[in-house]
Amino acid sequence: MIIESSAPTRVDLAGGTIDIPPLFLFHEGAATVNFAVNLMARVRIETRPDDKIILESVDRDVKFETSLDKLGELYNEPRLELLSKLVYFFKPETGFQMTTESEAPAGAGLAGSSTLNIACIGALNKLVGNRYAPETFIPIAANIECQVIKVPTGFQDYYSAQYGGTAAIHFRPDGMTREALNIDTKSLEERIVICYTGEPRNSGTNNWEITKRHIDGDAETFAIFEGIRDSSRDLREALLANDWVQTGEILKAAYPRRKNLSPNITTPQMDLLIARALTNGAIAAKVCGAGGGGCIAFFCEENRKADVEKALAEEKDAEVLRWNLCERGLTVREL
């Protein structure tokens, strides 16, 4: 049996960090807004006639082998820890090789690990006979990723990976709901530049420091999160109205708020790229994910996307990513 799965990464436009439990419970109307992009995470599982389990990450150039009788040891396996814990959870009863690969740069802030998580869950669930319903994939992914990074994890990234498209994720005491946003996709694509800075980052540590401040009752942090909540609400409305002028203004106003929340969200290299883009046709910069490296999404003036891309491409270590909005989420097929 051969199983292949894929899932899209995402660009988060508004609401980042407020999706980490329990923070959203403290801000009525908490939501995030993001869109999926076709920089995919891919998984291939091929069953074997023996009891060997082979796990391989092409991106990390790591590959190791174990066996079904040692499956319990995968819970504490440090190599390819996410994959190991997922295999331990699903407990397959046949030997197999699982190979993973991501099209997004490592540490890009595009939810690469969360996306790979969903793609692995889809493939492994198929391997064990569709043991779990698709609506359980997101809580499984969040809980296992929390075991790996050892701090609470946000939820928005799993929704874009599983469902694709442009969406607002609403967080309420009775649960989370995904609202698909019907927007002018072509106009969004013509306005957004995604640039990888050449510097990977670790989102878990950055977000945990912010989470602790919030729970400890820091008034300034609480006020910033209220503003983050408001930005998500306003951006959702602007996107639904296809109001690109207002969209740019909302993103522009959100940037200093995010910097106040976490001054280390940008590095000197990122500051340089932001300044370069803003003088060549960008209206606003949105650091992807938790920042401190990774990617920046730039919202551009009408017909200025090419100018921004050209200016960024001239900077050392910067890589302008080629992308399209991805309407389709997780796909799993048996060959």
Model regions and ranges:
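C-terminal nucleotide
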Residues: M1-A14, I18-I20, F26, N34-F35, ...
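Hydrophobic alpha-helical hairpins/lids featuring a short glycine-rich hinge
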Residues: K85, F89, M98-A104
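Short secondary-structure capping/junction motifs at helix and strand boundaries
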Residues: E93-T99, N130-F137
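Short pre-catalytic strand/loop immediately N-terminal to key active-site residues, enriched for Gly-Thr
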Residues: A104-A108, I283-A285
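A generic structural signal for short coil/turn motifs at secondary-structure boundaries
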Residues: G107-L110, K259-N260
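DPxDG-like acidic metal-binding loop motif
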Residues: L110-P134
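Glycine-rich active-site/cofactor-binding loop and its immediate structural neighborhood
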Residues: G293
